[in-house]
Each structure stands twice: as structure tokens, then as C-alpha cells.
């Protein structure tokens, strides 16, 4: 996905030898369907205070090191045309495939190698400083390992509990996931005529207020 490819690009740019393994024959499936197929690639209102977290300092650190403006600069470097839909939400004019192609090109520039349609079956410590990865296409020994499998929200795209199981195996603490984007299901028949209609609304909870449509 996007996070794994961005990580691979950064590591390759730092002159690390990088192998990106994905069980799918095509990478970037979630990118392809994001934003209705146009990829809502960033939000200019992405600020630390807009994140709910048990560690609020993490969002401050992460967003100060790589900002939405940095990604927009990358988009413009690849001549991808985009537009602002609402409240700082940026979408490609054409297709989400443009963002996938951009990330693949950046990976290639950073000399990242791809191993696609390759399932990771097991990970063990090869010794105190290395990992041994068992895959369908053979074993890999590496100094560093990043698991970027994403969440469990879209199982049909291949989402599994592999990352959680691996974290548990290596005694890495995992924060229990909570719903971040869920529908409101209303059974009142008198409201069925509103189905499919979007309109501006304001939602408040405690001291937080959200405006959207």
C-alpha cells in the first residue's frame, strides 16, 4: 500500500538495499479505490489537533517531519493535475492510478526491488541482529523489517490479522483498533427519501465540532 511504498522510497533514498514484498500481483489496491477512484491523496487541514490518540505527541512529530505540502510538491513534480474538493481535500483530476504510477517510479529511482504475488508465511530471528523471512518464493535474510499491511477494514482487498499476529509473536504491544469511519444506519421509513442526498452538517461531541457534507 501507500505507507509501505513511501517507507521503501525513504529507505532506498537513504541508500538502504530494499525489497518490497506483497502478496498481490498488483500493488496499491487501496489507493486505486480511494476517493471514488480519484485518490484523495492529502488534506491541507491535516493538523495534530485533529487527531484523537493516546499519544498526541506522535502526530505532532510525524506531521512536522512530513507535511501535506511535501506530498503536494511530489504530486506537482510528477505533473499530476489535482483539485480541491472541499475543506482542503485534494483529489486527482484524472485517476488514482496516477498516484500508484508515481510511487512505483519513485521506488524505482530509489532502487527498490519488488517481489509481487509472494506470500510471507513466517518471520523469525535469524540471530540477534537479523530477521529470516519465509515466503512462497524462498527465504530472505534482512537487517531491518517493516510490516506495512494496513488495517482490517477491507478484507476483500486482502486485509488479514498477519501484522497483529506477528507483533504478538515478537512481544510488540498492539493498541486495540477502534472504528474510525462508520455509517449511521437509520430504520425510520419516513427518512428513506433522504437516501443518497449529501448536505452540509455539523456534528459535535464534548468539546469537538466537525463540519462536513
Outline where the language-model segments fall.
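Residue-level detector of alpha-helix initiation sites
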Residues: 1-3, 26, 151-153
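N-terminal Rossmann-like FAD-binding beta1-loop-alpha1 element of flavoenzymes
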Residues: 1-20
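Predominantly flavin-linked oxidoreductase catalytic cores and closely associated redox partners
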Residues: 14, 23, 98, 102-213
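A short beta-to-alpha transition loop/helix N-cap that caps and shapes the active-site region
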Residues: 27-31
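Glycine-rich active-site loop/strand segments that organize a redox cofactor
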Residues: 36-86
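Generic structural signal for well-ordered, non-membrane alpha-helical segments
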Residues: 52, 64, 68-71, 92, ...
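Helix-loop-beta segment of a Rossmann-like dinucleotide-binding subdomain
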Residues: 53-59, 76-101, 132, 142-144, ...
